[in-house]
Each structure stands twice: as structure tokens, then as C-alpha cells.
Design a protein with these regions (language model features):
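Juxta-kinase regulatory segment immediately upstream of eukaryotic protein kinase catalytic domains
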Residues: 1-20
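Conserved structural core of kinase catalytic domains
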Residues: 89-138
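Structural motif at the C-terminus of the N-lobe alphaC helix and the adjacent alphaC-beta4 loop
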Residues: 78-92
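Conserved hydrophobic "DFG−1" position in protein kinase catalytic cores
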Residues: 32-33, 99, 113, 166-168
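C-lobe/activation-segment region of protein kinase-like
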Residues: 59-62, 129-142, 147-158, 166-241
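Active-site ExK catalytic segment of metal-dependent nucleases
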Residues: 40-46, 112-114, 180-182
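ATP-binding glycine-rich loop module of kinase domains
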Residues: 21, 26-81
Length: 241
């Protein structure tokens, strides 16, 4: 896939442990790929403060028998499915997926890393809200994302501010990328089977998201106290390198 630099790998295992992740979610940490800065590597967190989510297998099996949910495997499957459906068009609002690599922190998923025109890692909407952005100024960009999701029947879970990266273009353009949260959590995936139902569901998610963003902005965004008590990064970048 990508040439590996012997200075950053050992026995074809990419070294990440001594690097600082630019983003930390409840279950995963995101690192700049040490060989290709246009890509990132997502690895599952192993620390005790991570959010644990157990795979749903119904009530036939005790919870202790079920495996911990693998976000990476799920995301790779969904992004590959979208790519087989619409090809490179997905790159207008979604990261392209490049499969798995071995790292010293476990198996990692390689994806496009969304950056601004100046090369810095793009901030999440959650971080922009915390910085006091005027939401109305970016609503057209959000509408463009919504139209894309509806047009291609790309289902999402709740559309959350920390799962949206806002890329700033050279001419002042702004583009939203959905960097997490794709898929349908429904036990019976009717919205996947019937595109008209899927489009209705997507629109409902979009309609619910914007008022939630406005309410969060009114509350002042991520406070120092919230971030201090949190087991994840609250959508705030640790660096933009």
C-alpha cells in the first residue's frame, strides 16, 4: 500500500507508542501516519479509562461471553461498502480507507487525515463551537454534507459534533467530513434494505443534529471542567501536526 520507512518501523510494525495522538475518542486513539502525513491510523484503546462497548449477540449469551466491539473492523467494512457503491466520490465528505496495518499498539486502520489548506489537521465542529464559531456561517457546509448523505443513502448514527471535521479551503471554502459514526444501529436494518426509508432516516438525523449543535454552543461548548473529568478528548485536538 505505502512504502514504509525503516526509521519509523521495526519488523514491518509501525511505531506509534512514543507519538502523541492528535485525537482521543472513547474507544480509539488517532495518530498521524509516520510515513504518510496525509493519512492517519486509528487504534483501539487498551487503557482502563476507555469506553467499553460489548457486541450485541442477543440475550442468548451472557455478556461476559461476548467480545468487545471492534470499531475499526466495523468502520472498515462500512467504508469499503460505500466505496464499492460510489467510488472516489465518497472522498468529498468521507475519508478514504486503506485497510489495516500492524503497529506497536495493535492493529491499526489507515484512513485519510482531513487537513486545512495550510496543512494543519482540521478541527472538529465541537472544537469550533468551543472556540465560538458563528454556526450560521457554516450551515451551508452542513447542508452540503446532508445532501451528499441523502443522495447516496449513507446511513449514520446520531450526527455528533465531534464526529464532524471542518476543513478550511484556500479560497475560504468550508467542507464537512464525517470522520466517525457511519452506519445504522437498528437491529432490523430496514433503512439499509430500502433506500427511500434510508433517506427519510438520514434527513431525520440531520434535522435533529442542528438544534443540538446550537444548544451546545449556547452552553459554551467544552469547558475545562468537562475536559478534565472526561475519559476522552472531547473532540479537542491534542495537536495539529
Amino acid at each position: 500500500m505505502m512504502d514504509q520507512d525503516p526509521q519509523t518501523t521495526a519488523n514491518n510494525i509501525i511505531q506509534l507508542a512514543n507519538s502523541t495522538p492528535f485525537g482521543v475518542g472513547g474507544r480509539r486513539a488517532c495518530y498521524v501516519h509516520p510515513v504518510d502525513a496525509s493519512k492517519c491510523i486509528k487504534v483501539l484503546r487498551q487503557d482502563e479509562r476507555r469506553t467499553v462497548r460489548i457486541q450485541k449477540k442477543g440475550n442468548l449469551f451472557p455478556k461476559s461471553w461476548r467480545r468487545e466491539y471492534d470499531n475499526n473492523a466495523h468502520e472498515e467494512k462500512l467504508l469499503s461498502r460505500i466505496h464499492s457503491k460510489i467510488g472516489s466520490r465518497m472522498a468529498s465528505h468521507l475519508p478514504m480507507c486503506y485497510g489495516f496495518v500492524s503497529t506497536d499498539l495493535g492493529r491499526g486502520l489507515v484512513l485519510d487525515l482531513i487537513r486545512d489548506h495550510d496543512g494543519k489537521i482540521s478541527r472538529s465542529l465541537r472544537e469550533w463551537i468551543t472556540l465560538g464559531i458563528d454556526l450560521e456561517s457554516i450551515k451551508p457546509a452542513f447542508m452540503n454534507l446532508g445532501n451528499f448523505l441523502i443522495e447516496h443513502s449513507i446511513l449514520t448514527r446520531h450526527i455528533l459534533d465531534h464526529n464532524l471535521a471542518l476543513s478550511l479551503g484556500k479560497s475560504g471554502s468550508r467542507t464537512f467530513y464525517l470522520i466517525d459514526g457511519i452506519g445504522d444501529a437498528a437491529w432490523l436494518p430496514l433503512a439499509q434494505w430500502f433506500p427511500p426509508l434510508g433517506r427519510i432516516k438520514i434527513k431525520r438525523k440531520l434535522d435533529a443534529a442542528w438544534p443540538r449543535f446550537k444548544a451546545f454552543a449556547t452552553s459554551g461548548g467544552v469547558t475545562g471542567q468537562l475536559k478534565e473529568k472526561s475519559s476522552w478528548g472531547q473532540g479537542i485536538l491534542q495537536h495539529r501536526g
